[in-house]
């Protein structure tokens, strides 16, 4: 009898030990995958094979980020020194879009720049190493941007140009797209956005999708779309936006919106990264930002732009001053600490500086 009970005890012990190393099958089931690729139209660049597995597969890098044993899945309040799952390549200073194209992570915004001032500003930016230029129909400077790019001597494929359709163009988007192509005169448009929601925005976006198929536009996206608007809009279109461009700065941080957009495999870009609309001086003079800037031997503007990059937000500050344009490119020889990121996070006022 004792021999039988001893055998039973050994058997029970073996069963218990066999289950000790097993992890719950759904341990990571609820984790946000900010690099998860989305369903996308067929792309023409070979880089897409590395960034997405046939557009609906699982991104290998996302798998690596999401299966670390015991990893805390909650996004830190202020982000780490480089944001968790940051999609940016800080070596090449680019990000791979879900459309299969690479885009620079810093550039020049051209709002309020017109005529010769715009041409000179874009030229100064290109001479300073900038390869991302943002324009729009409503900026009335697409011709000037195109002129500067054409006359730069830089190969067209090395410069990434973004323009936008305004809501008053949504009723005839095909004509608006042709108008942008004619004004820029750059053979193709790297990215076209809808400037903000409006009547006919879905039809306008579908027209941009057709232009992608025709090779006139390479990537499409949205500007001034937030969570509620995206939840309504996305089910009605075929191509997931490659980018969403919103107002983002330390006083308006969109800490709930950014992770949502990134979780869809969409890149986030911030306009007015330095405040804008009369608020720039106030933001650059902020005591916390000034202290951090002094600690790194940098300007307040450089600290704010670096903060955006470490949050995974592409920056397009605007300027007509060649010195400031150059300064705004010098963002890659320092790094903010997690504590510094937290201090800037705490400056959030949820304060928009424009009506969009």
For each feature predicted by the language model, list its residue ranges.
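Bacterial N-terminal signal peptides that target proteins for export
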Residues: 1-8
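C-terminal motif of bacterial Sec signal peptides marking the signal peptidase cleavage site
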Residues: 16-19
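Short, low-complexity, disordered segments immediately C-terminal to signal peptides
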Residues: 21-44
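Terminal-tail/helix-coil boundary detector
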Residues: 22-28, 52, 67, 72-78, ...
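N-terminal binding-site loop/beta-alpha segment at the start of enzyme catalytic domains
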Residues: 60, 74-159, 274-275
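Short, acidic/polar
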Residues: 114-126, 170-184, 230
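CE4/NodB-like, metal-dependent polysaccharide N-deacetylase domain
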Residues: 174-194, 210-214
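Beta/alpha (TIM)-barrel catalytic core signal, keyed to glycine-rich beta->alpha loops juxtaposed to Asp/Glu
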Residues: 197-356
